[in-house]
A protein has these predicted regions:
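Single conserved hydrophobic/aromatic residue that forms the stacking wall/gate
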Residues: 1-7, 11
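N-terminal winged-helix
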Residues: 18-49
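Short, well-ordered beta-strand segments
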Residues: 22-29, 77, 127, 167, ...
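Residues at or immediately flanking beta-strands
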Residues: 22-24, 50-56, 196
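Short beta-strand-centered segments that line the small-molecule binding cleft or hinge
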Residues: 42-45, 63-98
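Short helices/loops that flank or line small-molecule/ion binding pockets
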Residues: 58, 63-74, 153-164
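C-terminal regulatory
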Residues: 90-164, 169-192, 212, 219-227
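Periplasmic-binding protein-like
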Residues: 190-204
Length: 227
């Protein structure tokens, strides 16, 4: 144990001495409120190991994050899984549950939902994300009646709150609207889907030491990830 501790201390000293510059991290919308996401813990861990590295955190869409990783603007990304790019390396981190919601002024609010089916949902205007994502894949697969699009989940929430549209949101994000009586989950045991979130790195050139260290921190704080 003494040898292991000494080796760990030596590693930390080397990291502190040699690692500097800036690390650009990009994450998908509304991850901070997800109890399964421990990105803040990864940031804390990284900051302890590499205090001289300046951190810059961005929130962006899946496609913008992947493009940014490929062109070198971002070093590490965290996104929901969708379709993989051959230029990128992905590693599983955590999950998220998406439920279907309506706003307080919607016809389905406060009504029984037992008779609702995916087919019946097509009678109601749907608001979905504008970019390729698990949200878009599901709405196409279920043939929902898309009448509005949002660039991110904040936009979807506004559309749902209008009372004119149904839409999917992360359960952890929508819970505060539910508690305030502004939204209702519609038959959550039936109308839901789950998605996995992954870290994203560029395959070539090889990640910088700071990038690899942050990736290691992400993996360390998500022990339940699918390996």
């Amino acid at each position: 144990q003494g040898v292991s501790s000494a080796a760990s201390d030596l590693y930390k000293r080397q990291v502190h001495r040699r690692m500097g510059g800036q690390l650009e991290i990009a994450v998908f919308d509304k991850t901070a409120s997800n109890p399964q996401a421990r990105i803040a813990e990864a940031i804390a861990r990284f900051a302890r190991h590499a205090p001289e590295v300046a951190l810059s955190v961005h929130v962006a869409s899946i496609s913008a994050i992947e493009r940014g990783i490929i062109d070198g603007r971002f070093h590490v990304g965290v996104i929901p899984t969708h379709r993989n790019s051959q230029s990128l390396a992905y590693a599983d981190l955590f999950g998220e549950t998406m439920l279907l919601y309506c706003g307080r002024q919607h016809a389905l609010f406060g009504q029984p939902h037992d008779a609702l089916s995916w087919e019946r949902l097509r009678d109601y205007p749907f608001a979905g994300l504008a970019h390729h994502s698990p949200n878009m894949e599901l709405s196409h697969r279920a043939n929902l009646t898309r009448k509005a699009t949002g660039s991110d989940e904040e936009a979807i929430a506004l559309l749902i709150l209008s009372g004119q549209f149904l839409g999917f949101l992360p359960d952890h994000y929508a819970s505060r609207f539910e508690q305030q009586g502004q939204m209702q989950a519609i038959a959550p045991e039936r109308f839901h889907y789950t998605c996995r979130f992954v870290s994203v790195l560029r395959k070539s050139p090889q990640p910088t030491r700071a990038t690899q260290l942050f990736q290691d921190c992400l993996m360390a704080v998500h022990p339940d990830a699918i390996r």
